[in-house]
Amino acid sequence: MSGISAQLVKKLRDLTDAGMMDCKKALVEVAGDLQKAIDFLREKGLSKAAKKADRIAAEGVVALEVAPDFKSAMMVEINSETDFVAKNEGFKELVKKTLETIKTHNIHTTEELLKSPLDNKPFEEYLHSQIAVIGENILVRKIAHLKAPSSHIINGYAHSNARVGVLIAIEYNNEKNAPKVVELARNIAMHAAAMKPQVLDCKDFSLDFVKKETLALIAEIEKDNEEAKRLGKPLKNIPTFGSRIELSDEVLAHQKKAFEDELKEQGKPEKIWDKIVPGKMERFIADNTLIDQRLTLLGQFYVMDDKKTIAQVIADCSKEWDDNLKITEYVRFELGEGIEKKTENFAEEVALQMK
């Protein structure tokens, strides 16, 4: 115990929630190295905080903060094990300090965050101490930190239930439009919170992903058509493609010629083809970009005007405001997304306890 101060023992106890004597022994074993002592207790199964940190954390909050000038914004997903803990004051303070640390040290990843200083110690130590105090595993799972040049606006939306957050960055040219772009970015963020687009644009998809999704989509439509046929309702068109990335110039030219050949066969005069073909092409593109309409932000129909896609809204605003608007970044966090929650089996639990 020589050279091991009471303050160091207390610090280790605060970080691990292990017993006082176990903390003393651990520090002696590793010659007073705090991090090695934490690892020692964890390996021995004596760190209660470490045990808590092994448990699945799928509740918590999504929180964001947008700068007053709308030139930067931060968003985090911080997980706890229960929604009850996510509502207590200690957890709320942790969320606040996390955002402050991200802003102060210009952090973009969870790895950077854990190493960053907070109150003269690494953030990771602070996090471990909060796990011990609060009594649940807490995990900073995702960080988004957007910064933009003067020609961009960044705005966001966090749902009141703190389970969904979105950040949107829009490029613009005309400074007088800045207030309108701020509002537009927030409205589009609200749309994305509700409609769950996976990516900004179809260019973010791989061709393999599109082909697999298209096969699933065709199977879904065929099944719907069976029911529609039974009920005497109109049938949906079966698409050949699923995304705009598949509609090359050659594909579109081939389809245009097919429509023209069809009109010729029907005996329609060539002088009226230009009035008919564009509408048919528009319908063809709509029928063959259903994956974009479901999964891309730009391809989805706007919740505030469901006759226009987000891309059309951006184009219309550009024209109306004499500007050239472009969505350059889109980030959406949904609490616990992708986390496999543990399913408790009460019967198995009782059986194990009886062995």
From Swiss-Prot:
<dbReference type="InterPro" id="IPR014039">
    <property type="entry name" value="Transl_elong_EFTs/EF1B_dimer"/>
</dbReference>
<keyword id="KW-0963">Cytoplasm</keyword>
<dbReference type="InterPro" id="IPR036402">
    <property type="entry name" value="EF-Ts_dimer_sf"/>
</dbReference>
<protein>
    <recommendedName>
        <fullName>Elongation factor Ts</fullName>
    </recommendedName>
</protein>
<keyword id="KW-0251">Elongation factor</keyword>
<dbReference type="GO" id="GO:0005737">
    <property type="term" value="C:cytoplasm"/>
</dbReference>
<dbReference type="InterPro" id="IPR009060">
    <property type="entry name" value="UBA-like_sf"/>
</dbReference>
<dbReference type="InterPro" id="IPR018101">
    <property type="entry name" value="Transl_elong_Ts_CS"/>
</dbReference>
<comment type="similarity">
    <text>Belongs to the EF-Ts family.</text>
</comment>
<comment type="function">
    <text>Associates with the EF-Tu.GDP complex and induces the exchange of GDP to GTP. It remains bound to the aminoacyl-tRNA.EF-Tu.GTP complex up to the GTP hydrolysis stage on the ribosome.</text>
</comment>
<keyword id="KW-0648">Protein biosynthesis</keyword>
<dbReference type="GO" id="GO:0003746">
    <property type="term" value="F:translation elongation factor activity"/>
</dbReference>
<feature type="region of interest" description="Involved in Mg(2+) ion dislocation from EF-Tu">
    <location>
        <begin position="82"/>
        <end position="85"/>
    </location>
</feature>
<dbReference type="Pfam" id="PF00889">
    <property type="entry name" value="EF_TS"/>
</dbReference>
<dbReference type="InterPro" id="IPR001816">
    <property type="entry name" value="Transl_elong_EFTs/EF1B"/>
</dbReference>
